[in-house]
From Swiss-Prot:
InterPro entries: Exonuclease_RNaseT/DNA_pol3 (IPR013520), RNaseH-like_sf (IPR012337), RNaseH_sf (IPR036397). It comes from the Bacteria. GO terms for molecular function: exonuclease activity; nucleic acid binding. This is Uncharacterized protein UU112. Signal peptide: none annotated.
């Protein structure tokens, strides 16, 4: 096996094979259940695909079944052929005399096991690992996932096809075609954008009662984005925020908007404190599960007023602890905001980003421009 670690050495007249393998998740032997790929010659403008599914003759756990959407993609796996020598030879013929493009070394290891078992010459295989490429170029161990890189490359991801090996190989092919001529600066800009891209799985510190403080930091999966418009309790109770539910990498239409409750509160002469406490509880509930965006700098004074009001009305003390989804650092009440010019510089160029972030960025740009004029 030969490793190609320089993307500039890959020429248009070489055959490239983009592969993805799905396998069982047994504690013992991981067996291949799908081998898929695209073979491409850029200069000749030729491309064809390979897609085979196999009966692993092995128990498949529920996690893998859910991940691979088994009922749809492998509903008749018992009737599928075994991965025998003939099938292995077909795979070998598909990848030989080409540069094999992978994402991580998992696929190349599975091919090594397969070809070694059947005595095929694995030494003739040349491969290029896109994951290692980013790891080396960006000097980071936190390389974006295949699907995050797909989004960053401008691919419109069909989330219903994820973890179908043929579709994953297609995404890999598109990523490679996007990055092959990018400069180091352009690759780094992609990565900087990734820092602000909502993740499928992430954790957050969350609002905790005083009696829970001794338990330390409690982590929870972030399920929502909270976009805070106003957080002002000087002359009125202005807790204006919108909540979006996470849907894969992006966020849905708002599932909650506090403006209606604020209108009700402003129209009430009595029982307004009851409504304020109700709204505060909704705020705390979503805050415990949310990444937070705001165009306002939430001062210590305003935070103290809000928390003091809540304690007076409920006799319950709340402590605000939030880990921002993007910047990966604790946001304290005194700087409870994302405010960085870099967000505008990177994200505003990308049309994929969700509309609520566009709204935020436009407002922030106006604020920043005004600050520059004032200075």
């Amino acid at each position: 096996m030969k490793i190609c670690d320089n993307i500039s050495e890959i020429n248009d007249d070489q055959d490239l094979v983009f592969i993805d393998i799905e396998a069982t998740d047994s504690k013992g032997e991981q067996r291949i259940i799908q081998f898929s790929g695209y073979r491409l010659n850029i200069k000749k403008n030729k491309i064809f695909n390979f897609n085979k599914k196999f009966n692993p003759e092995q128990e498949i756990n529920s996690r893998i079944k859910t991940l691979l959407n088994f009922n749809k993609n492998f509903n008749n796996i018992e009737q599928m052929p075994k991965l025998d020598k003939q099938a292995a030879r077909e795979i070998y013929c598909f990848v030989k005399n080409a540069i094999v493009i992978t994402f991580t070394d998992f696929d190349i290891k599975k091919m090594h096991e397969l070809f070694t078992y059947y005595n095929f010459d694995f030494e003739k295989i040349v491969y290029f690992d896109v994951y290692k490429f980013f790891e080396k170029k960006l000097q980071t161990k936190s390389v974006p996932s295949l699907f995050s890189l797909g989004i960053l490359s401008g691919i419109k991801i069909n989330f219903f096809k994820l973890h179908n090996a043929l579709y994953d190989a297609f995404i890999l092919k598109e990523i490679f075609m996007c990055i092959r001529h990018k400069t180091n600066e352009e690759l780094y800009e992609m990565y900087r954008y990734y820092e602000f891209l909502p993740k499928i799985i992430s954790s957050s510190y969350f609002v905790t009662n005083e009696q829970e403080k001794n338990r330390g930091i409690i982590k929870k999966e972030i399920k929502y984005v909270m976009y805070i418009k106003e957080f002002d309790f000087s002359n009125k109770f202005n807790l204006d925020f919108v909540v979006y539910k996470k849907d894969h990498h992006f966020y849905s239409k708002p599932i909650y908007d506090s403006s209606l409750e604020l209108q009700t509160i402003s129209s009430l002469t009595s029982k307004s404190n009851f409504m304020k406490v109700k709204l505060a509880n909704i705020f705390f509930n979503y805050l415990s599960k949310s990444a937070v965006f705001s165009i306002k700098k939430l001062s210590i004074k305003q935070s103290e007023k809000f928390l003091k009001f809540y304690k007076t009305q409920t006799n319950k003390r709340k402590v605000i602890k939030v880990l921002n989804l993007n910047l990966k650092k604790e946001i304290k009440p005194e700087n409870f905001v994302i405010k960085a010019q870099i967000i505008c510089e990177i994200l505003f160029k990308n049309p994929i980003i969700h509309h609520f972030v566009h709204e935020y960025l436009k407002i922030f740009q106006n604020i920043f421009s005004q600050e520059e004029k004032d200075n």
